[in-house]
Amino acid sequence: MIPSLREWYEKYGDKGLVVIGNHFPEFSYERDLDNLKDAIVRLDVPYAVMQDNDGKTWKAFNNRYWPTMYLIDKQGHLRYFHIGEGAYQKTEDAILALLAESYP
């Protein structure tokens, strides 16, 4: 998933796409901020990543599975989500549709 997110960030970031990774740790060592920073560098993640140690964001989206992708429009409404790997073309099509929308 990270390669696709990286590609979309680089391709559409200047067109308004904002990518934010949500890191919800599964293991105790993943809670350490330095370990997360190392992983961001090692995996060449160019977009923002938040550390969700207490799971507040995870719970707010009623998330039970990862990876999960959410697309939120410019007005803050959830417009698309996908659970698991795959559906990359469908997700990119949804990104393009949202970027094409105009807002007052």
Predicted regions and their residues:
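Conserved helix-turn-beta segment immediately C-terminal to the redox Cys motif
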Residues: M1-H23, I40-L43, A97
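Short, solvent-exposed loop/turn and secondary-structure capping segments
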Residues: M1-I2, D32, F61, F81-I83, ...
